[in-house]
Amino acid sequence: MTLSPTTADKFTFGLWTVGWTGADPFGVATRAALDPVEAVHKLSELGAYGITFHDNDLVPFDAPASERELILKNFRAALADTGLKVPMVTTNLFSHPVFKDGGFTSNDRSVRRFALSKVLRNIDLAAELGAETFVMWGGREGSEYDGSKDLAAALDRMKEGVDTAAGYIKDKGYNLRIALEPKPNEPRGDIFLPTVGHGLAFIAQLEHGDIVGLNPETGHEQMAGLNFTHGIAQALWAGKLFHIDLNGQRGIKYDQDLVFGHGDLTSAFFTVDLLENGFPGGGPKYDGPRHFDYKPSRTDGYDGVWESAKANMAMYLLLKERALAFRADPEVQEALAASGVFELGEPTLNAGETTADLLADAASFEDFDADKAAERSFAFVRLNQLAIEHLLNAR
């Protein structure tokens, strides 16, 4: 397979990624600001499918209407010239000081009303640009001090905000779905809806949960010490993997936003294996964009920025090649069977069997030899060794 990306790969980048100037809490920018039009053209040249943005990545927070219209006109022209898509749009409810205590969950009601109005206006923009997903990351929705929030009220306000936005989408007839992006902390000490599991539980309480799903990010789940592949698998199983953010992370620390695969490489391999091959026994598959949410190293100039963009796509394609070979290997299929992976796909109860039938089945309890069953070797290490050998292109 070719390692040159094409639009068929559906690789997308946030404007805030390649446009990150390198400013962080400890230092100022190391690169000049990037013109969004240049970003569109350069990403198109590199083989990307699309570009995404927060509203204020594209249009400054306090831009007058005339400036906003000019920026959008130039951006739309660049999209038309290149054919680059805008599959996802999101709203910045975290940078301006007005959002220091959150947007949807601020203790200040006037701020909540402003935040919700800002979101609704950007839903309109997302629809105008043909986006199919509207991501909500509540970076400031949380606290540092447990006594500073009525937690039930905060969740009520979060529900109110998401349901209002989802209801607006339905009322307008937009072809849009909302994807919530979990993160455990940073910038807040503790962020509401910190993991995929929290997000799924929250969605179950929504009035319009049918069009609300998740946008899990590699580093965010790994910051919480969780298995990213398990997280996206559960979201996919629940029919709620609406979007995905790929990057690299090395352990439980700050959000590193490394190039995809430059952190936990084995985890990245199994993530791509799931995205490209699906579950071993079949079931739902992800068909959305492969979105890179990372930060180019602040040690590099813009030559390094574009190299890092290419690196994300190359890493994914390399891992895709290895994952396809892994699943196609007859020895791997034999190892999967020997380890009972396919057996797990068989229902525990027989067709039509009741609990009374199960309790009456002596073979399942009275005559079951637990000691004998405990002797089974599942050979999981052998299976994983095969995966690593494929990952290293040693097979």
From Swiss-Prot:
User: Which cofactors must be present for this protein to function?
Assistant: Mg(2+)
Disulfide partners: none
Give the record's GO CC terms.
Answer: cytoplasm
Reactions listed under catalytic activity: alpha-D-xylose = alpha-D-xylulofuranose
| Binding residue positions for Mg(2+) 2 | E217, H220, D255, D257
Record key words, sorted: Carbohydrate metabolism, Cytoplasm, Isomerase, Magnesium, Metal-binding, Xylose metabolism
Please provide the Gene Ontology terms (biological process) for this protein: D-xylose metabolic process
SUPFAM superfamilies, alphabetized: Xylose isomerase-like (SSF51658)
- Kindly list the positions annotated as binding Mg(2+) 1: E181, E217, D245, D293
Cofactor remark: Binds 2 magnesium ions per subunit.
Name the family: Belongs to the xylose isomerase family.
Q: In its UniProt entry, what is this protein called? A: Xylose isomerase
Q: Which lineage is the organism of this entry classified under, starting from the top rank?
A: Bacteria, Bacillati, Actinomycetota, Actinomycetes, Micrococcales
Identify the coding gene. Answer: xylA
